[in-house]
């Protein structure tokens, strides 16, 4: 249970996404409020990461989720980048009139997917984080429905991402066939020992 403290940033962002959706449903004209709450949520998640300094490398969920110095640094960089995007895009979304409750929520979902990818130590967890990030970015790429270029970008991104996801899954299946595992550490050990799962 103590180790679960290390994933409080991810848990908090997940709860923030659900809370912001509820606020958007029950409170009309709440786009600006949700936008500001999103920035506050990212700041709180950043504070949670700093509140739990990493002394050693830790693994969670049967070694499928890893917390270390590198993953912590990359999460901090991701959250800071998310805050920067929110601050710099505030005027743009108002000028183009695309400031809706979905915009900050999708951005939070994408950031959550990135954080899952960063700490993933398993092919399945990595793929889940990748899809969570990608699905949000599909919509964000085509968010300005009145702009044909935005719609075109969203469609192209979706098609290319669907193709790349299929190739990734195929590659993951080959790796699993060679190593008999989806865990990164076990995959490396099996490959280093020249044990490719061949009979």
Over which residues does each language-model region extend?
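Alpha-helical transmembrane segments of multi-pass membrane proteins predominantly involved
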Residues: 1-199
């Amino acid at each position: 249970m103590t180790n679960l403290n290390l994933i409080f940033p991810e848990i908090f962002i997940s709860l923030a996404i659900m809370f912001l959706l509820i606020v958007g449903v029950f409170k009309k004209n709440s786009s600006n409020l949700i936008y500001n709450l999103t920035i506050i949520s990212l700041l709180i998640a950043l504070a949670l990461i700093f509140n739990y300094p990493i002394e050693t490398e830790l693994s969670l969920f049967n070694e499928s989720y890893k917390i270390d110095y590198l993953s912590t640094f990359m999460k901090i960089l991701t959250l800071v980048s998310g805050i920067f995007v929110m601050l710099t895009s505030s005027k743009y979304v108002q000028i183009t009139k695309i400031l809706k409750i979905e915009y900050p929520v999708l951005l939070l979902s994408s950031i959550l997917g990135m954080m899952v990818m960063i700490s993933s130590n398993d092919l399945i967890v990595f793929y889940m984080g990748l899809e969570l990030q990608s699905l949000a970015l599909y919509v964000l790429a085509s968010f300005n429905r009145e702009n044909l270029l935005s719609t075109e970008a969203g469609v192209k991104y979706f098609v290319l991402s669907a193709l790349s996801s299929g190739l990734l899954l195929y590659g993951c299946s080959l790796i699993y066939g060679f190593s008999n595992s989806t865990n990164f550490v076990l995959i490396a050990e099996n490959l280093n020992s020249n044990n490719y799962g061949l009979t």
